[in-house]
């Protein structure tokens, strides 16, 4: 079996799949290397012999995790690396190595699934969007703060904005004007996400009319799903691209 890791800025997403047909065996999300090692160590009946990962962390942090995995599980993790082209997709950045690896793999994965023009929106700590032509040419994209960053900035820099996660979750049940601070902040940030997503659709239509696919991924994908009719919600889109970047025999 294969262990796959998506090491983001805030969390590590992991899953174990079969080597023969990529069937999902187990998976989860943790907030630290220690939690990952503990979680994997407690699994029963899910032994893995191979590992591939993508990381947007520093080289030092990534190397530390790779060493820990090698020491603990006697595996040799294969790490995704920047590339000017992959699986028919041409990296659109002027300096291809500066494009975030998780972002790169997400839209490579999306293009692989449809072999046509696509818009990919990833809603995580940050929000990213990317546009890929039917030819595989990446036209570029946008980056803006995600829900966690917007929320935390307001909590950090505005003294009277204080509320807990339970209040935040309750506030998002509806999107009418808020009558409490948590409602006003959470709903306002949610509307900004939705507005961003709808603007991406408008831009994509300027390029391709209605002849394109929409992919949405990331932890907050559910917050925009209803304003993106026909969008494909693919939580593991980065892993689709990771398999293309790091094929294991």
UniProtKB/Swiss-Prot annotation:
Its cofactor is NH4(+); K(+). One of its GO terms (cellular component) is cytoplasm. One of its GO terms (biological process) is coenzyme A biosynthetic process. Substrate binds at residues 93, 100-103, 181. It catalyses: (R)-pantothenate + ATP = (R)-4'-phosphopantothenate + ADP + H(+). Pfam families: Pan_kinase (PF03309). GO terms for molecular function: ATP binding; metal ion binding; pantothenate kinase activity. NCBIfam families: baf (TIGR00671), PRK13322.1-2 (NF009857), PRK13322.1-4 (NF009859). Catalyzes the phosphorylation of pantothenate (Pan), the first step in CoA biosynthesis. This is Type III pantothenate kinase. It comes from Pseudomonas syringae pv. tomato (strain ATCC BAA-871 / DC3000). The lineage of its organism: Bacteria, Pseudomonadati, Pseudomonadota, Gammaproteobacteria, Pseudomonadales. The gene is coaX.
